[in-house]
């Protein structure tokens, strides 16, 4: 019993978001995916507007992304785990292709989670977006376009390639995957939301640095 207790304490002490370990604070993919981010480190957030945890981490993640400057190429992919999510995925892809996603991203989250609006309904999403400044005709034209359908198929391929089964999940450089859930398990106990999100950002810092160093060494 004493040995077991000491072992647990040692494992807990080894957990550190600033020095993350594969298999604990993050996962290393067996099959890394090619990225198209040029000299920058690609960071992808897989998320869903339906997801309360995605809503909760969004402010911390936005702040982290803004602090990275030109070091990273950041993008979001709205997941599709079942057909009921299709309209929200299509809405995000539409807004992204219109270059309007960032302007209304937080507002959609608030509409869904703070004000409990049924934005999973296409008509209600369209009405909501019109009220927050999106041109309805341009939105609907893009929403129905072949380009959006093509992007959605590409997103589905990414979802399968990265074996994403829950959200939020954040992929760095096509090879490292982390999330608040990784940190919750690693830190043990019951970390508060702010602690959990701060630790996740620290892991992202370390993974971006790791990826950048590997890229520099490969030149």
Predicted regions and their residues:
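C-terminal cap of thioredoxin/glutaredoxin-like
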Residues: 132-219
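Extracytoplasmic thiol/disulfide redox context detector
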Residues: 1-86, 204-219
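Long, low-complexity, intrinsically disordered polar/charged segments
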Residues: 6, 101-106, 138-142
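Extracytoplasmic/secreted envelope proteins and their assembly/folding machinery
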Residues: 58-65, 88-92, 105, 122, ...
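Solvent-exposed, flexible loop/coil residues
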Residues: 30-33, 83, 123, 168, ...
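Solvent-exposed loop/turn segments at secondary-structure junctions
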Residues: 49-53, 80-84, 110-115, 145-148, ...
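Structural microenvironment flanking redox-active thiols in thiol-disulfide oxidoreductases
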Residues: 69-97, 102-130
């Amino acid at each position: 019993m004493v040995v077991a207790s000491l072992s647990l304490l040692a494992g807990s002490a080894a957990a550190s978001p600033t020095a993350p370990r594969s298999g604990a604070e993050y996962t290393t993919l067996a099959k890394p995916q090619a990225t198209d981010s040029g000299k920058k480190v690609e960071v992808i957030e897989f998320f869903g507007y339906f997801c309360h945890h995605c809503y909760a981490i969004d402010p911390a993640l936005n702040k982290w992304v803004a602090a990275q400057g030109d070091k990273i190429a950041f993008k979001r992919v709205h997941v599709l785990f079942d057909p009921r999510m299709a309209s929200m995925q299509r809405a995000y892809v539409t807004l992204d292709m219109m270059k309007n996603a960032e302007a209304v991203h937080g507002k959609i989250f608030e509409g869904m989670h703070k004000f409990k609006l049924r934005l999973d309904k296409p008509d209600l999403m369209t009405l909501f977006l019109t009220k927050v400044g999106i041109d309805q005709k341009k939105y609907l034209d893009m929403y129905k376009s072949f380009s959006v359908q093509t992007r959605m198929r590409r997103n589905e391929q990414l979802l399968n390639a990265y074996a994403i089964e829950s959200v939020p999940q954040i992929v760095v450089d096509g090879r490292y995957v982390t999330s608040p859930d990784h940190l919750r398990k690693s830190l043990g106990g019951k970390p508060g939301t702010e602690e959990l999100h701060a630790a996740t950002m620290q892991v992202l810092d370390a993974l971006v640095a790791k990826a950048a160093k590997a890229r520099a060494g490969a030149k």
